[in-house]
């Protein structure tokens, strides 16, 4: 495995560990999720370029669309939670309440 792919997989693993370790704040979780999506985008782009598979060139763009949607929903949720509760602690949220 080339060193570039190893570094990208290491970045993905670091972001995944960040989600698992810093899960008390919503903002930290969102930043780690964005890091995971960025490393996945780079890995998919490099894999598509290395394979010379022309039909898969749209895959990184679709991944970016999903990342943008995830970021928009995450920021909307962060704004709603911080306006309602005044903090972004995930532990204090109960999503089962109406």
UniProtKB/Swiss-Prot annotation:
Xref: InterPro entries: NADH_UbQ_OxRdtase_chain4L/K (IPR001133), NUOK/Mnh_C1-like (IPR039428)
Single GO MF annotation: NADH dehydrogenase (ubiquinone) activity
Protein origin, superkingdom: Eukaryota
Catalytic activity of the protein: a ubiquinone + NADH + 5 H(+)(in) = a ubiquinol + NAD(+) + 4 H(+)(out)
Gene3D superfamilies per UniProt: 1.10.287.3510
Record-level GO cellular component terms: mitochondrial inner membrane; respiratory chain complex I
Leading EC class: translocase
Pfam families per the UniProt record, alphabetical: Oxidored_q2 (PF00420)
GO biological process: ATP synthesis coupled electron transport
Bilayer topology: Multi-pass membrane protein
Transmembrane segments: 1-21, 26-46, 61-81
Secretion signal, residue range per the UniProt entry: none
EC number: 7.1.1.2
Cellular location(s): Mitochondrion inner membrane
Entry keyword set: Electron transport, Membrane, Mitochondrion, Mitochondrion inner membrane, NAD, Respiratory chain, Translocase, Transmembrane, Transmembrane helix, Transport, Ubiquinone
PANTHER family xref list: NADH-UBIQUINONE OXIDOREDUCTASE CHAIN 4L, NADH-UBIQUINONE OXIDOREDUCTASE SUBUNIT ND4L
Protein family according to the UniProt entry: Belongs to the complex I subunit 4L family.
Subunit field text: Core subunit of respiratory chain NADH dehydrogenase (Complex I) which is composed of 45 different subunits.
Cited function: Core subunit of the mitochondrial membrane respiratory chain NADH dehydrogenase (Complex I) which catalyzes electron transfer from NADH through the respiratory chain, using ubiquinone as an electron acceptor. Part of the enzyme membrane arm which is embedded in the lipid bilayer and involved in proton translocation.
Designated name of the protein: NADH-ubiquinone oxidoreductase chain 4L
Gene it is expressed from: MT-ND4L
């Amino acid at each position: 495995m080339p060193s570039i792919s190893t570094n990208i997989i290491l970045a993905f693993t670091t972001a995944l560990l960040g989600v698992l370790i810093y899960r008390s704040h919503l903002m930290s979780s969102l930043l780690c999720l964005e890091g995971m999506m960025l490393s996945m985008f780079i890995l998919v782009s490099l894999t598509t370029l290395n394979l010379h598979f022309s039909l898969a060139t749209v895959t990184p763009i679709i991944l970016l669309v999903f990342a943008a949607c995830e970021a928009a929903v995450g920021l909307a949720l962060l704004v709603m939670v911080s306006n309602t509760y005044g903090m972004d602690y995930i532990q204090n949220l109960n999503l089962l309440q109406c």
